[in-house]
Design a protein with these regions (language model features):
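Amphipathic alpha-helical interface segments
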Residues: 3-78, 85-92, 99-100
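Hydrophobic alpha-helical segments
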Residues: 73, 77-81, 107, 127
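Solvent-exposed alpha-helices and their adjacent loops that cap or buttress functional pockets
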Residues: 93-95, 113-115
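The canonical Cys-X-X-Cys-His
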Residues: 100-108, 118-127
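Long, repeat-rich segments with strong aromatic
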Residues: 108-114, 132
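Short metal-binding segments enriched for Cys and/or His
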Residues: 129-138
């Protein structure tokens, strides 16, 4: 799952183009890098960057194509794990924010060990225009 999340966070999606078989919007649609595996962040960022309404056919088509991309990548990762066994190494390193924040929030025995998960912390906690700055005045 970690490998799939990192790929999703850093890859311009959607990639898949069903051509004339598309049920919604035919042809190429815009792609973007989500920076998060969370659906609401991913789709909202895509809509914002491309000036496309969340209720549009283009948005629905994007989600369908993205689902195909994710399924394909998941199978590729599973096949690699089967082929490589214990030698399997993730292609995507842990994000700096996870390492940094995890020193306190993901370390057993620490007072602040209440974090769970290894998603990139910055999309939700970077202090951007739409999110609170959890890094300000913080160790």
């Amino acid at each position: 799952v970690n490998e799939l999340f990192r790929w999703y966070e850093t890859t311009a999606l959607p990639i898949y183009n069903p051509g004339e078989a598309a049920r919604g919007v035919k042809g190429k649609i815009p792609s973007n890098v989500a920076d998060s595996p969370l659906c609401h962040l991913s789709v909202s960022k895509w809509c914002f960057e491309n000036k496309i309404e969340a209720t549009s056919k283009e948005r629905s088509e994007r989600c369908g194509r993205l689902t195909a991309d994710v399924c394909k990548k998941a199978v590729e990762i599973l096949n690699r794990k089967i082929e490589e066994g214990n030698a399997f190494k993730c292609a995507y390193p842990m994000q700096k924010s996870v390492s940094y924040c995890g020193e306190c929030h993901l370390t057993k025995g620490n007072e602040a060990n209440w974090g769970k998960g290894i998603m990139d912390c910055t999309p939700c906690h970077s202090g951007g225009p739409a999110v609170s700055d959890k890094f300000k005045d913080h160790p």
